[in-house]
Amino acid sequence: MDSVSASGAQRQDEGLRERIRSSQAVDVNAVDQALATAGYGVTTDSRKNDNKKTFGRTPDGTVFTVPQTHDMVSQLLSPTEPKTVSDFVVLAILATHILIFVALAPEARISVFAAIYMFWRTSYNGGIGWLLHNQSHHNTMVRWATKSKIFVNPSTGENPHPTLYRLLKRDMETMIPEDYSFDDAPLEYNTWLVFRRIVDVILMCDFASYCLFALACGSRPENETALMTTLRWAAGWVLVLFNLWVKLDAHRVVKDFAWYWGDFFFLIDQELTFDGVFEMAPHPMYSVGYAGYYGISLMAASYKVLFISIIAHAAQFAFLVLVENPHIDRVYNPPPPRKRSIQHDSKDLHALNNSQTSPISDSFPATPDDKAAMRQPAPSSVHNLLGLHNLDLHRVTDSSVILIQLLVFALTVLTPSTPFYQYLFVANAAIWRCWYSIGIGYILHRQSKYKSWTRHFVKYGENTDEAWRQWKGSYHLSMTMCYASFIAATWKMYTMPSDWNHGLALLKHTLGFSLVALQIWTSVSIYDSLGEFGWFFGDFFFDAQSKLTYSGIYRFLNNPERVLGLAGLWGAALITSKGAIIFLALLSHVLTLAFIQLVERPHMQKLYGRSLRQDAGLVKSLKRSLPPPLQQLGGSVDRMMDESFEFVEELLDSARPKLATGVNTFMKDAKSLFRQYPARITISRLDDEVAAGYDLEDYSLEIEGTESSPSAQVERSSGKEGVHARAPPERRGDLKSLIFEYGAPIRVKWTAPLNHSKRDWVGLYMVTDNTRREVTRVSSQGRWIATNEGAYDSLTCEKGLISSDIVISASRRRDGENRDLASGEMVFSGDKLFWTTGVFEFRYHHNGKHNVMAISRPFEIRIGRFDEDDVLNMDNNTTSSNSDAIIQAAIEEALLPVVRNCFDRDPEIAPETYDEHFGSLVDRDGKYAKRVVFAVHQMFGIELAPEVVRADGNVRNMAWRICNAKKVLAPYSMSRSRGTSTPTTQEKELS
């Protein structure tokens, strides 16, 4: 696409501080009505001013006016802003840092302030990260505020902290003089205000302690000239000022709401415009927003400051990946609506079941949906190549790549680093780079113009999918060899510094490895944006989309591989400081630019024409900041580059016939030459309350679940046992063994004394995991539910809770006791279940600890095996022509309830019919497909990859695939009725 709209669903790669516009526009009349209901006055005369206000929306739907607030620095340091008690506390802490710095001896300042800074940095990335993670998943901070009642007016008599209430009210209303009332504001907003004051303390102390640490480490290197000192300080100040501009411009765009992670608490209904720094780089607050750290390191001329800056920067990226990005995906990028089932008439379904497939090279013929997919422009991506998680040694491409890499590694390590071998490795790297750029470029150029690669495979009866697979393998092998040979050459040319403190050795290694990391990040970002199809130039082989999509790193750069994608090569050149590696890096850069200009660009222009954008976000921002004469100069340079490449193209076109003639002559001579010359002790500590008087007879657990299929019951006595064990077991009571369906929800009913602890909880365990009945010694791993709502600072532990503390009178007790009981119900489903087979039990625990008060009956989760012989024997109309259709229909019937269980019976993703498509969340979260894979393996003995489940997309396609897989594997089966097996005695006699 030409440009990407700024909707939250489409900017998933942005940082949290780049909050996107709301999902819907504000209905002013509805807002006025909601505000009036909440007690806010809205008059007709103020209609014009209302359009400038920001409205917030809490998770429960409450709409409120979000008042204007000021940034942290202005609030603390501006004399025009009113000061609060918390402001003076922050200023006092900052002053304490300065006093400590002055009081310490110079030699002690470095270690002390390194420790202080790391404390505040850990508080930032670890402490704030932990708070935000729990707020995002469990609404923890708001629940704390609710339980502590610190925002409840003391006049009601419910607030146990009236002094804290008055202090917070005075501070907040002083800090926000307009459009704000502490008593009327929503709980979420007040909680956010308190949270941002904590953030103010941490951020200010983090930056202040860093600056003091840099000041303690600052020095001037020996023998440094005045010119070098001037340049060093000038470059440092440029980076610091650039950092300051990034922060100010980012705050101008996102305001305090996103600056302080406001959408972890509430959302705003407002259109946000993102420009400036957000067009320059991804996550500018965390990427280019840390340039000042390196500027300060440069001015301090200290490796200590540089390395602690790198550690802080890495911690910030970890904070982004682990805390912010998951929240962004959950809030702003929900799964799209699922595809509903498409109704077919009976004739279509009959034709679908009885369709015959033509022989193809794959072991599994294409399913009905696969046949439709073959008419689509792009192939389905099931068995990807890139990434260690996609490594498959059964695939010839992967095994070849691994073997060749081992060979390169062995040659690199075992050969000496003499000039001869150095020259050999450098020449090898140059040859592979030439092949990777020129050879691959020639193939793609021919494919773009004449479809020559595809035509070759069609000539031998193959299809486009086979051509695509072979191309991916060739390109993947070429790419890995290109970089492996470069790494080998770098290793041969590298010499370990004898003195790391001499010269710029340490700095060059640091910058070099940083450039390598930058190239790795760029490659990962490119792959995330393009996918497997784009990475392997899929639009050279299949019809492309009518509109380009600029997402991810391509929002900022048109061709990121042109500069950032080669940063690691220059990093290696910087580390080795050898002319040969510099030559390889320069050669690689020139060839890559030529590949983009001569191969990629013409093809993209042919496909997309005017829809190709001219300038990316970064270029637009830079052009806007340049004066008009320099902008014209940039256009002139672009024209000169285009004319130069056109001249080179014309030169190559004119020389091609002569080169072709020479190559043919060389090949003939070479062939003639080859023809001529062939040749422990456990002590359990019980809670005092348990020993003090709780009667264990008052506690009980009863469970209900969906019984497993009859085949699962039969498999317990299948003829493999001794003679006496084949008969059903004799039972002396009316209770039978509990065998439940795989993945089906399990309802748990509990009873406890009326005065039981509100922090009691029930957990699910495997029977073999706990050897003691009175104490649980294994963690529940999230498979637990609290008996009462609000007892824990987590929403997850309340998921599945149905009822609590329903009184059961003594007259209804079965054991004859005369005490009333409390009871409740809960349902374990989804992530609270074990997704495997085995024997399990529920345990009731006391007061948030692991003392066991009651244990349920053990129950088994078993998946019955599918027996096609039974299916055929039950159908009297079975013939050889319709047996496959009957078996496939039976597989569909057996598979549908299992798939629904694997998808948590969620109406958004679980299918209702055989043809209904799976929800899009199945593609995002791999756990659902892995559950189905396990169930299919247990039921049918067929092992599928999770990617196949996602690609099939519905139960009918999966049933078809399983049916055909069983047919393919039938010759290797020991079944009597299916496939070619060893002849039986009767068959021998008949023969």
Swiss-Prot record:
Gene3D superfamilies: 2.60.40.2840. The gene is cho2. It catalyses: a 1,2-diacyl-sn-glycero-3-phosphoethanolamine + S-adenosyl-L-methionine = a 1,2-diacyl-sn-glycero-3-phospho-N-methylethanolamine + S-adenosyl-L-homocysteine + H(+). It is found in: Endoplasmic reticulum membrane. This is Phosphatidylethanolamine N-methyltransferase. Pathway: Phospholipid metabolism; phosphatidylcholine biosynthesis. It comes from Talaromyces stipitatus (strain ATCC 10500 / CBS 375.48 / QM 6759 / NRRL 1006). GO terms for cellular component: cortical endoplasmic reticulum; endoplasmic reticulum membrane; perinuclear endoplasmic reticulum. The chain crosses the membrane at residues 85-105, 112-132, 198-218, 226-246, 280-300, 303-323, 401-421, 424-444, 473-495, 511-531, 579-599. GO terms for biological process: methylation; phosphatidylcholine biosynthetic process. It is a multi-pass membrane protein.
